[in-house]
UniProtKB/Swiss-Prot annotation:
Protein name stated in the entry: Trigger factor
Taxonomic source organism: Prochlorococcus marinus (strain MIT 9215)
Cited InterPro entries: PPIase_dom_sf (IPR046357), PPIase_FKBP_dom (IPR001179), Trig_fac (IPR005215), Trigger_fac_C (IPR008880), Trigger_fac_C_sf (IPR037041), Trigger_fac_ribosome-bd_bac (IPR008881), Trigger_fac_ribosome-bd_sf (IPR036611), Trigger_fact/SurA_dom_sf (IPR027304)
Subcellular location: Cytoplasm
NCBIfam families assigned: tig
Described function: Involved in protein export. Acts as a chaperone by maintaining the newly synthesized protein in an open conformation. Functions as a peptidyl-prolyl cis-trans isomerase.
GO BP term (any one): 'de novo' cotranslational protein folding
Region (Disordered): 436-476
Molecular function per GO: peptidyl-prolyl cis-trans isomerase activity; protein folding chaperone; ribosome binding
Annotated HAMAP family: Trigger_factor_Tig
Length: 476
C-alpha cells in the first residue's frame, strides 16, 4: 500500500503573506506520536521502572494523553511545515502562524485521523517599478563658502588654547563657566531627569543647552545664583520634555577663558604638523572642499534614491520592517559594548521599546529603498561579476591575514558583492536620470524693502550613456 502524501494548498494574501492549507496523513500523526512517547520514555523517571523500560500505558497514565498529544503535535506541525516549504519551493520571511491557534488544534487532534491545519507566513514581496529610466529630481545647489576656512582655523585655535582663570569680570560668550544647576518642570514642580549637576564645565556658546540657558549665564559673576525660566524646544531629544516650561536654579562656581594661540607658522606646526600657516590653510581648504563635494554628491544620490523608491510598487510585509528594526537595535547595542558600556543593564525593556518606536520610520524607509534598488537590478539586469568581487577582495587580504579574529569569508564576500552592486546601481541612476540644480542668488536688502529679492537659476544635468558617447565623438 502506497504511503499517503502530505497535501498542500497555498493561497496568496495581502501584504505579501501566503496561506498554507495542510492535510497531514494520519500515518504521519501516529508515527510522530510514537516517536514522542519513545523519546520521553528514554528519559522519564517513574518509581518502580527502569529508565527507558517504562510501558507505554504507564507513561500515558503518568504524563497524560493531552500532554503527549501536545508534544507530538508540535513535532507534526513543524515536520509538515518544512516539507510543505520544499514542495512549494517557498522561502518564508517569518515564523508560521497557526491560524486556528494551538489549543484549538490540540482539542480536535486525533492521531487516527488526518490532521488539517492552516498556517500563514510572510514571503518576499513581488517587486515592480513604474519607471526606472528618465527619473527627474530637483536639488538645491550651494556654493563652497571660503569663510569656512577661517572658521575651521578659529576652531583649531580654540582646541589648542590655554585655559586661564577669570576673576575680575562677568561671564561672556566664549568663556568656560563652571556651574551647578537644578531643573524642574514649571507645571508639576517635578525634577527633570538629567537636569541636575553639581559641577559642569560649560562653554558659553550659542545653541549649547536649551534656548536661553547660556544667555542666562552671560553677565553672571562668580558666586552668583540665578533663576532661569526656560522652555524646552518642541523637537527636544527627550520626548517627555518637549514643549514644557522649566525652571533652573543656576550657580556660577568658577569662570575660565581661552587664551588663543597666534596664527603663525608655529601654530601650523603644532596643530597640523605643517611647515607654514600657508600650507596649513591649503590643507584645510582641500579637506573642506572634498567634504563639500561629497556632501553635494550625497544630496544628489539621496534625491535619486527617493525618486526611485517612489516608483516602487510592492506590498511590503511587516516582518521585513521588524527585522530591520531589530538589526538597528542590535547594531546600537554593539556600539554600546564597544564603548565599554554594560549592555544588559543599559538596554532595559523600556529603552528597547523606545528605540523600536523611534527607529521604525527610518527602518521602513531603508527597506523600501533596498527593495527599489533590488527591483532596479532585476529590471535592468545589473549584476556583479565574480572577477569584480575577487578584485575587491584583494583590498582586504592584508587585514584578513593580520586579524586575530576569525574572518567569515562568506559573509565578507556577500557584503562586498552588495556594496559593488549598490555602486553600480547608483552610477546607472546618475547616467539615466535628470537632475535639476537650483542656485539662489540673493540681492542686498534696501532701506525701503522688508523682504529680500531672490533670483532662481535652474541648471539641468542629464547624463546618459548616449550623451557621453556623443561628447567623445565631438571631442574627436
Amino acid at each position: 500500500m502506497a504511503k499517503e502524501a502530505l497535501i498542500v494548498k497555498t493561497t496568496p494574501l495581502p501584504q505579501s503573506r501566503i496561506s498554507f492549507e495542510l492535510e497531514i496523513p494520519s500515518e504521519t500523526c501516529k508515527t510522530c506520536l510514537n516517536e514522542t512517547i519513545s523519546s520521553i520514555s528514554r528519559s522519564a523517571k517513574i518509581p518502580g521502572f527502569r529508565v527507558g523500560k517504562i510501558p507505554k500505558q504507564v507513561l500515558i497514565q503518568r504524563i497524560g494523553i493531552t500532554q503527549l498529544h501536545a508534544s507530538a503535535l508540535e513535532k507534526i506541525i513543524d515536520k509538515s511545515w518544512q516539507e510543505a516549504l520544499k514542495i512549494k519551493s517557498i522561502e518564508p520571511l517569518s515564523e508560521p502562524e497557526l491560524v486556528d491557534g494551538f489549543e484549538s488544534v490540540l482539542a480536535n487532534f486525533s492521531p487516527e485521523k488526518p490532521l488539517k491545519v492552516t498556517l500563514q507566513t510572510d514571503v518576499a514581496p513581488e517587486l515592480k517599478l513604474k519607471k526606472s529610466k528618465g527619473l527627474s529630481v530637483e536639488i538645491s545647489k550651494t556654493k563652497f563658502d571660503p569663510k569656512s576656512i577661517d572658521e575651521a582655523l578659529q576652531k583649531s585655535r580654540s582646541q589648542f588654547a590655554n585655559i586661564i582663570p577669570v576673576t575680575n569680570r562677568a561671564a561672556r560668550l566664549g568663556d568656560i563657566a563652571v556651574v551647578s544647576f537644578k531643573g524642574k518642570y514649571k507645571d508639576s514642580d517635578k525634577e527633570i531627569d538629567g537636569g541636575t549637576s553639581e559641577s559642569m564645565d560649560l562653554e558659553l556658546e550659542k545653541n549649547k543647552m536649551i534656548p536661553g540657558f547660556v544667555e542666562g549665564i552671560v553677565k553672571m559673576k562668580i558666586g552668583d545664583t540665578k533663576t532661569l525660566n526656560l522652555k524646552f524646544p518642541e523637537d527636544y531629544s527627550h520626548e517627555d520634555s518637549r514643549g514644557k516650561e522649566a525652571i533652573f536654579e543656576v550657580n556660577l562656581k568658577d569662570l575660565k577663558e581661552k587664551e588663543l594661540p597666534e596664527l603663525n607658522d608655529d601654530f601650523a606646526k603644532q596643530s597640523g604638523n605643517k611647515e607654514s600657516l600657508k600650507e596649513l590653510k591649503k590643507d584645510i581648504e582641500k579637506q573642506l572642499k572634498d567634504n563639500f563635494e561629497k556632501t553635494q554628491k550625497d544630496i544628489k544620490i539621496e534625491a535619486l534614491l527617493d525618486a526611485l523608491t517612489n516608483e516602487l510598487v510592492a506590498e511590503i510585509p511587516k516582518s521585513m520592517i521588524d527585522i530591520e528594526v531589530r538589526n538597528n537595535i542590535e547594531q546600537t547595542a554593539q556600539r554600546f559594548a564597544q564603548q565599554g558600556l554594560d549592555v544588559k543593564s543599559t538596554f532595559t525593556p523600556e529603552l528597547v521599546k523606545s528605540l523600536a518606536e523611534s527607529t521604525r520610520p527610518q527602518a521602513e524607509k531603508n527597506v523600501q529603498r533596498n527593495l527599489a534598488l533590488k527591483a532596479l537590478a532585476e529590471t535592468e539586469n545589473i549584476k556583479v561579476e565574480k572577477d569584480e568581487i575577487d578584485l575587491k577582495m584583494k583590498d582586504y587580504e592584508d587585514a584578513i591575514s593580520q586579524s586575530s579574529k576569525q574572518i567569515d569569508i562568506k559573509k565578507l564576500t556577500e557584503v562586498i558583492s552588495n556594496d559593488l552592486l549598490k555602486e553600480k546601481l547608483i552610477i546607472w541612476l546618475e547616467e539615466n536620470s535628470e537632475v535639476k540644480e537650483n542656485t539662489t542668488k540673493t540681492s542686498k536688502t534696501t532701506k525701503n524693502s522688508k523682504t529680500t529679492k531672490a533670483t532662481k537659476t535652474t541648471k539641468t544635468t542629464k547624463t546618459t550613456k548616449t550623451s557621453k558617447t556623443q561628447n567623445k565623438k565631438e571631442k574627436k
